[in-house]
């Protein structure tokens, strides 16, 4: 399942989730399918998982969220989808806002601020 998320195989992954695989399945580091899709730059997979109830507020063992991963990878589409699903840019030990600030990603910071009215 995790490789499907990493590789952006949206339709195949969605079929497994529709057949009963937990949409919030985590690996040994606490990374969800949603986090892996966001980190590896697959906004279509992010959208497919969100449509099936993936929780954008889940944190891995480092306190990172899917939104933080999408910001780090500078995926505007994934960031927008996650914000639209209610992701909090201030959540986590390494929040999306902190990540955008630390890595000097002004376009991501603007998107986060505009998207959540912060």
Range-by-range predicted roles:
Residues 12, 44-45, 77-78, 107-111:
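Conserved ankyrin/ankyrin-like repeat signature
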């Amino acid at each position: 399942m995790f490789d499907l998320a990493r590789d952006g195989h949206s339709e195949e992954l969605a079929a497994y989730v529709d057949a009963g695989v937990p949409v919030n399945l985590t690996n040994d580091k606490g990374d969800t399918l949603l986090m892996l899709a966001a980190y590896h730059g697959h906004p279509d997979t992010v959208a497919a998982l969100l449509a099936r109830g993936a929780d954008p507020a889940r944190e891995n063992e480092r306190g990172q969220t899917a939104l933080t991963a999408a910001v780090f990878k500078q995926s505007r589409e994934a960031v927008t989808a996650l914000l639209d699903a209610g992701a909090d840019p201030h959540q986590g030990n390494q929040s999306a806002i902190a990540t955008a600030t630390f890595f000097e990603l002004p376009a991501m910071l603007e998107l986060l601020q505009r998207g959540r009215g912060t």
